[in-house]
């Protein structure tokens, strides 16, 4: 028995691949990885001991491109699919799991060509174009969101790494705010952090700001101009995000699915700013259920004024009829919403099929 994991591009997809790879390793099952040279795949897995072999193809996404660029991208995908077909055959792969993203294309189609059972994890509340096409052909589609076309869909807990649960805690007071721009940075959140930093630091609230590598020097300059560089923990990215989340009492974040569920597992109340240009507005739908259950605050990017942060802080500090702060209630309920061992459930479901 040997698995192939494929997909990625961004940290959200790749964190799922990592969680599944860790579970496969725990169960003594060998796995290989197939991704792309474009995006973050190599950064995450080029030297990862979780995989016996790692392959990266020259592929790019097809969505939101001009006609001629789409043709070029499709050609690269097809070329890589035939390479992947030989790789899967060479390694005698018995199961393929796609975590989505354009880099999942070649190995997913190669699995179908080789008649290898294909399993998909759909991370978002709205399916991406590749998964919409592949879902009917897959053995099973795992997701933490309920889809209308039930078919071969399996509702499971999100495959969050156990460290997010291990570092969870119940929040009782807002002393530390985390501005989380995501793996690619987020200009709107970076600006929101800068605008709020003077008032927050004046109130004695600590700030950790993960701004993305492209914005790091610029953010450093602006904080220095404000005289706040020594009062703000500023990072381009952070290798130990679980520890960063653990220290925070409130987070401001994009609404990529992995971030949403990792914050949930950590019990960290969050203001979500969905990326307005995400395909099919999927980031908004990723947190819609949370918003309906009063487990988060959602602010559209075009309404992101500095006062919004302090409005949310006031609401979180309010108490219910039992004398409990909304902050504490939300933190507790978030930890109850997601079950541990989502990755284990997915792997065991596949093995029992």
From Swiss-Prot:
Disulfide bonds: none
Positions contributing to UDP-N-acetyl-alpha-D-glucosamine binding: 10-12, 124, 183, 283
Catalytic activity: di-trans,octa-cis-undecaprenyl diphospho-N-acetyl-alpha-D-muramoyl-L-alanyl-D-glutamyl-meso-2,6-diaminopimeloyl-D-alanyl-D-alanine + UDP-N-acetyl-alpha-D-glucosamine = di-trans,octa-cis-undecaprenyl diphospho-[N-acetyl-alpha-D-glucosaminyl-(1->4)]-N-acetyl-alpha-D-muramoyl-L-alanyl-D-glutamyl-meso-2,6-diaminopimeloyl-D-alanyl-D-alanine + UDP + H(+)
Pathway the protein contributes to: Cell wall biogenesis; peptidoglycan biosynthesis
GO terms, molecular function: UDP-N-acetyl-D-glucosamine:N-acetylmuramoyl-L-alanyl-D-glutamyl-meso-2,6-diaminopimelyl-D-alanyl-D-alanine-diphosphoundecaprenol 4-beta-N-acetylglucosaminlytransferase activity; undecaprenyldiphospho-muramoylpentapeptide beta-N-acetylglucosaminyltransferase activity
Example GO biological process: regulation of cell shape
UniProt keyword terms in alphabetical order: Cell cycle, Cell division, Cell inner membrane, Cell membrane, Cell shape, Cell wall biogenesis/degradation, Glycosyltransferase, Membrane, Peptidoglycan synthesis, Transferase
Broad class of where this protein is predominantly found: membrane
Enzyme class: transferase
Subcellular location: Cell inner membrane
Membrane topology qualifier: Peripheral membrane protein
Coiled coil: none
Enzyme Commission no: 2.4.1.227
GO cellular component: plasma membrane
Function: Cell wall formation. Catalyzes the transfer of a GlcNAc subunit on undecaprenyl-pyrophosphoryl-MurNAc-pentapeptide (lipid intermediate I) to form undecaprenyl-pyrophosphoryl-MurNAc-(pentapeptide)GlcNAc (lipid intermediate II).
Assigned protein family: Belongs to the glycosyltransferase 28 family. MurG subfamily.
Name the record gives this protein: UDP-N-acetylglucosamine--N-acetylmuramyl-(pentapeptide) pyrophosphoryl-undecaprenol N-acetylglucosamine transferase
Organism the protein comes from: Helicobacter pylori (strain Shi470)
């Amino acid at each position: 028995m040997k698995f192939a994991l494929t997909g990625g591009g961004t940290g959200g997809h790749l964190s799922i691949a990592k969680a599944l790879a860790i579970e496969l390793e725990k169960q003594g099952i060998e796995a290989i990885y197939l991704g792309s040279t474009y995006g973050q795949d190599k950064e995450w897995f080029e030297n990862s001991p979780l995989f016996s072999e790692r392959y990266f193809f020259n592929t790019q996404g097809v969505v939101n491109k001009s006609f001629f660029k789409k043709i070029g991208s499709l050609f690269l995908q097809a070329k890589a699919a035939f390479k992947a077909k030989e790789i899967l055959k060479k390694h005698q792969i018995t199961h393929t799991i796609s975590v989505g993203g354009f880099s999942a294309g070649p190995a997913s189609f190669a699995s179908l060509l080789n008649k290898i059972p294909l399993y998909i994890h759909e991370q978002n509340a709205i399916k991406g174009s590749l998964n919409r096409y592949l879902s009917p052909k897959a053995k099973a589609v795992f997701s933490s969101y309920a889809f209308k076309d039930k078919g071969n869909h399996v509702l499971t807990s999100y495959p969050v790494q156990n460290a997010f649960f291990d570092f969870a805690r119940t929040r009782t007071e807002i002393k530390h705010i985390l501005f989380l721009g995501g793996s690619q940075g987020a200009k709107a959140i970076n600006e929101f952090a800068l605008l709020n930093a003077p008032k927050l630091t004046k109130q004695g609230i600590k700030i950790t700001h993960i701004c993305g590598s492209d914005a790091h020097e610029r953010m450093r300059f602006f904080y220095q101009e404000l005289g706040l560089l020594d009062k703000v923990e500023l990072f381009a990215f952070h290798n130990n995000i679980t520890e960063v989340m653990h220290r925070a009492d409130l987070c401001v974040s994009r609404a990529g699915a992995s971030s949403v569920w990792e914050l949930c597992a950590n019990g960290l109340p969050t203001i979500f700013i969905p990326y307005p240009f995400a395909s099919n507005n999927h980031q908004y739908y990723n947190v819609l259920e949370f918003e309906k259950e009063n487990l988060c605050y959602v602010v559209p990017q075009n309404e992101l004024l500095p006062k919004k942060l302090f409005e949310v802080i006031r609401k979180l500090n309010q108490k219910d009829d039992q004398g409990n702060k909304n902050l504490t209630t939300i933190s507790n309920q978030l930890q109850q919403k997601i079950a541990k061992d989502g990755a284990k459930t997915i792997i065991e479901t596949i093995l029992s099929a």
